């Protein structure tokens, strides 16, 4: 039986107001360990930058499982050194879904081709495992994946193409197109906020 109790929390802003600041998180774990010592059994962070800062500053030496979010390359590699795990937002599937919907529109084929229905090259994702479709939103969503000691090696090569959708389409049926695709958040301030 486990008891979950929040010992402390803090908004992680630096003096310039930037949020989710790794250095602030590293400093916070020092303050918290001075106050709570061996009462800290696990560290959970909203991102791997802060998680890795707390892991390197204290949790690694004290063998306290630390978990983050984003599957940053340093966090994935640190799983071999005791970092508890992270969450991949499945960026490869996010990119594939975006480009595949665009490709399907350009080719004039069913929107689900190569997503939930195999295309001529055999590309097909698994709904509920790789993505979900919302009829109400008319949107595809990549599903997050837990990255743990059991599977972290699958996430060490960021250039690896996702096997389920790695096959090239026939150029004669899907000719090359010149497309400008610009993606950013609505406020266009993600890195500066």
Please give the residue ranges for each predicted region.
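A residue-level marker of the well-folded mature domains of exported/periplasmic proteins
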Residues: 1-193
